[in-house]
Amino acid sequence: MAEHKSDFSTDLKKGDTVIVVAGKDKGKQGQILQVLGKKSSVLVEKVNMIKRHTKPAQNREGGIVEKEAPIHISNVMIVDPATGKATRIKKKNLEDGRKVRVAAGSGEVLDK
């Protein structure tokens, strides 16, 4: 079986602060917990919460657990650290040869 390759390439990384631009959680901000490459989705902290009913097991109690559900990357944008608004990402080569991600709005470097 051939491996499914995503149609979307993402410049988002774990730990980036993003804002939701579409859907039921539009306007909410949070940090990326996980990037799901094959699904072209991200898990964002405290955004798109769902309830899961779990059975009791040896190491955990049963009950209703709230957890984050994936959001498609087309529905989130990175937050510009300089302005606090949603922005696109550009890539830039620095003098020392490193490739870094740059906020398109302000030109602020996103990589540390």
UniProtKB/Swiss-Prot annotation:
Disulfide bonds: none annotated. Keywords: Ribonucleoprotein, Ribosomal protein, RNA-binding, rRNA-binding. SUPFAM superfamilies: Translation proteins SH3-like domain. Pfam families: KOW, ribosomal_L24. It comes from the Bacteria. GO terms for biological process: translation. SMART domains: KOW. InterPro entries: KOW, Rib_uL2_dom2, Ribosomal_uL24, Ribosomal_uL24_CS, Ribosomal_uL24_KOW, Translation_prot_SH3-like_sf. Gene3D superfamilies: 2.30.30.30. GO terms for molecular function: rRNA binding; structural constituent of ribosome. The keyword rRNA-binding applies. GO terms for cellular component: ribonucleoprotein complex; ribosome. PANTHER family: MITOCHONDRIAL RIBOSOMAL PROTEIN L24 (PTHR12903). Part of the 50S ribosomal subunit. Belongs to the universal ribosomal protein uL24 family. One of two assembly initiator proteins, it binds directly to the 5'-end of the 23S rRNA, where it nucleates assembly of the 50S subunit. One of the proteins that surrounds the polypeptide exit tunnel on the outside of the subunit. This is Large ribosomal subunit protein uL24. It comes from Magnetococcus marinus (strain ATCC BAA-1437 / JCM 17883 / MC-1). The gene is rplX.
